[in-house]
Regions:
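Soluble extramembrane regions of membrane proteins in the secretory/endomembrane system
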Residues: 1-314
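Selective detector of the "anchor" transmembrane alpha-helix that sits immediately C-terminal
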Residues: 317-322
Length: 322
C-alpha cells in the first residue's frame, strides 16, 4: 500500500523503483515509449529530448519524468523515482522492461492512455531504461481477451532474451492480467471471472516459458503484484522470491516485523541485494526480505497466506466500511 487501502499501478510501480513510497498519477504514469514510436509531431525520442533537455539514450523513455518528479517532491513520502535503476546501473547491472497493458491500438481521449507503468520500476532518475520493449509490437488481436488484445508470447520471450544477458535485471509484466482486471468495469461479474481465469492461465504459461530461460541454481526470480485489484475491497498482494541458497519458508522484513508480511517498499532493496548492489539503508524506506519461518509444506504456507488475507479483508471492512 502506498497512499491508501488500494494501490494504483502507477504508485505501485513507482514505489517498486524507489524503495520508498512514491506516487505517479494515472494520467501521466504510463507514458513510456520506445525511441521510434510516434508521439506529438515526431518520435518519442524527440519528445523525450524536448521535455527533458537530454537525448534519449536508452531503448525506453518515460516522457513525463519531470512532472512525476515534481509530484513526488510535493508528496509527504519522499520517494526518489529511479533509485533502484540508478543503483543497479552504478553496480554494472543492466536493466530491461517488457510489457504493454494498453487498452487500444491507438490513443483517443483519456480512456485510451498508454498503460506502460512497468517502466517506472527499472528506469533511472532521468526516466530511461536501456533495454526492453513496451510498445504495441508485443500485442496481437484476440477477440476472447479483455479489450480484444493479448500479449504475443513469442515476442515477449524474444524481448526478454535480448535483455537477459550477463548481469541483468529484467522485468516482464503479465499485462493480460492487468487488462483483464481493468475490463471488470465494462462486463458482468460472471464474464469478468471467465476473462480473468483465461488471462491467469495465459500468464502461467508465459511464466513457464520465461523460466525455461532461467538457471534457478544461479539466477533469482521475483514474482510481485505491484497494484491492487480494481473494486472497493483491497486484498493483500503476492511477493515471492526464489534465489540460490535462500531456502524455503515465509518472508518477513524489518519494516513489518511480522512473519509472512512484507511491504511494497521492501521490493526494491530486495532486488538490489539479490543483484549484488544493495541500496543504502539510510536512503530508502524499505529493507531486504529474509526467511522468517523455514520448513513446512507449500500447502501449509499457502494456507497461512490465504488466512492472513481473509483476516486483512475483514479488518479493512470493519475499520473502513465505506
Amino acid at each position: 500500500r502506498v497512499t491508501g487501502l488500494s494501490t494504483a499501478p502507477g504508485n505501485g510501480y513507482a514505489t517498486l523503483g524507489s524503495g520508498t513510497r512514491a506516487v505517479a498519477p494515472a494520467l501521466i504514469a504510463g507514458a513510456a515509449f520506445g525511441q521510434l514510436e510516434l508521439l506529438e509531431a515526431g518520435t518519442a525520442a524527440e519528445a523525450f529530448a524536448r521535455r527533458s533537455g537530454r537525448p534519449l539514450a536508452g531503448a525506453i523513455g518515460q516522457v513525463n519524468t519531470n512532472a512525476l518528479r515534481d509530484n513526488n517532491s510535493s508528496s509527504s513520502f519522499g520517494g526518489e523515482l529511479g533509485a533502484l535503476g540508478d543503483r543497479l546501473a552504478e553496480g554494472g547491472v543492466s536493466r530491461g522492461v517488457v510489457g504493454n497493458a494498453d487498452w487500444a491500438l491507438r490513443f483517443v481521449g483519456t480512456t485510451d492512455l498508454p498503460r506502460r507503468e512497468a517502466a517506472l520500476a527499472l528506469m533511472d532518475q532521468h526516466g530511461e531504461v536501456p533495454c526492453g520493449v513496451v510498445d504495441q509490437s508485443l500485442l496481437v488481436k484476440d477477440a476472447d481477451y479483455a479489450f480484444g488484445l493479448r500479449l504475443d508470447h513469442d515476442r515477449v520471450i524474444s524481448a526478454f532474451s535480448h535483455c537477459w544477458r550477463g548481469r541483468s535485471v529484467v522485468l516482464v509484466e503479465a499485462s493480460d492480467l492487468r487488462r483483464a482486471d481493468d475490463y471488470r468495469a465494462f462486463v458482468s461479474s460472471e464474464r469478468s471471472d471467465v476473462i480473468e481465469k483465461q488471462a491467469l492461465e495465459n500468464a502461467d504459461s508465459l511464466v513457464g516459458q520465461l523460466l525455461d530461460s532461467v538457471d534457478l541454481e544461479r539466477d533469482a526470480v521475483v514474482v510481485v503484484a505491484p497494484s491492487s485489484r480494481s473494486g472497493r475491497v483491497a486484498h493483500l498482494n503476492l511477493f515471492a522470491v526464489h534465489a540460490p541458497r535462500m531456502g524455503t519458508g515465509l518472508l518477513r522484513s524489518s519494516v513489518t516485523r511480522q512473519n509472512s508480511f512484507v511491504s511494497i517498499v521492501d521490493v526494491a532493496p530486495t532486488v538490489a541485494a539479490l543483484a549484488g548492489t544493495p541500496q543504502d539503508e539510510g536512503e530508502v524506506e524499505g529493507r531486504p526480505v529474509t526467511i522468517s519461518r523455514r520448513g513446512g509444506t507449500p500447502e501449509g504456507r499457502l494456507e497461512t497466506l490465504v488466512d492472513a488475507n481473509t483476516d486483512a479483508v475483514f479488518r479493512d471492512r470493519v475499520l473502513f466500511p465505506f
